Amino acid sequence: MGSREEELRAIVRDLGISPYFLGTFDKRFPGFLHKDKLSCAIVNTAARETGGAHWLALAWFPNAKNFYFFDPFGFSDHKLKQIYQFEYEGLLRRSALAGDGCVNLVKSTETVQGPNSAACGLFCCMFLHAFVNWPDRPMTRNPTMDLLTGVPNADMMKPSSLAILRENQNQLYKFLSTHSQYFRTHRPQIERDTSFNKLLELKNQ
């Protein structure tokens, strides 16, 4: 099932991201329309009418002209397009940033989420917390994202990687429990909806 949009917006509010948050969007996200403003969004790889597929986080740091693209699976652009028919290059072209000269694309390249986990939206909230607090280094070398350990995407199904990714999800829940009143109030339901093996559970129903 994963995270509903209203859940993500409530957690974003608790994490202090709201002043910079454009909202939750489906794959038709129009891009960053104000090139001089620190801003971020959570974007689904599918159209809203399909019920959604996978959440990504996008962020814009104008001081360094950095466009951050956070995918909890760390998929390549080719794989995102292959699996979800989603490509960030088209999104960049739609954005006001496209005509602003050189834009630095900074992309997550490692997997932090288990292959059958439905917690992608929650990982995006965690990343955006890092972004609004450390916009020059939101991917690594900050107290939020350093709670997680990335593994190469090609190794995500290995038993040794699964143990690391399961611990990442535990750290994610612990982080949200510390920082989000909404998460604490609704924790049992959120953990059921986003569990580490949620996709397997759905397949076996």
Swiss-Prot record:
Query: What is known about its induction?
Result: Expressed in the late phase of the viral replicative cycle.
Q: What is its main location?
A: virion
Q: Where in the cell is it found?
A: Virion; Host nucleus
Q: Where is this site: Cleavage?
A: G51, G52
Keywords (alphabetical) are:
Autocatalytic cleavage, Disulfide bond, DNA-binding, Host nucleus, Hydrolase, Late protein, Protease, Thiol protease, Virion
Is the keyword DNA-binding assigned to this protein?
A: yes
Q: Which GO terms describe its cellular component?
A: host cell nucleus; virion component
Annotated coiled-coil segments of the chain = none
What is the E.C. number?
3.4.22.39
What molecular function does GO assign, one term?
cysteine-type endopeptidase activity
Q: How is this chain's activity regulated?
A: Requires DNA and protease cofactor for maximal activation. Inside nascent virions, becomes partially activated by binding to the viral DNA, allowing it to cleave the cofactor that binds to the protease and fully activates it. Actin, like the viral protease cofactor, seems to act as a cofactor in the cleavage of cytokeratin 18 and of actin itself.
| Catalysed reaction, written as an equation | Cleaves proteins of the adenovirus and its host cell at two consensus sites: -Yaa-Xaa-Gly-Gly-|-Xaa- and -Yaa-Xaa-Gly-Xaa-|-Gly- (in which Yaa is Met, Ile or Leu, and Xaa is any amino acid)
Active site located where? H54, D71, C120
Keyword match Zinc-finger: no
Check the record and name the InterPro entries matching this protein: Papain-like_cys_pep_sf (IPR038765), Peptidase_C5 (IPR000855)
The similarity annotation says:
Belongs to the peptidase C5 family.
Complexes and interactors: Interacts with protease cofactor pVI-C; this interaction is necessary for protease activation.
Q: What else is known?
A: All late proteins expressed from the major late promoter are produced by alternative splicing and alternative polyadenylation of the same gene giving rise to non-overlapping ORFs. A leader sequence is present in the N-terminus of all these mRNAs and is recognized by the viral shutoff protein to provide expression although conventional translation via ribosome scanning from the cap has been shut off in the host cell.
What's the protein here called? Protease
Q: Which organism is it from?
A: Bovine adenovirus 2 (BAdV-2)
What taxonomic ancestry is recorded?
Viruses, Varidnaviria, Bamfordvirae, Preplasmiviricota, Tectiliviricetes
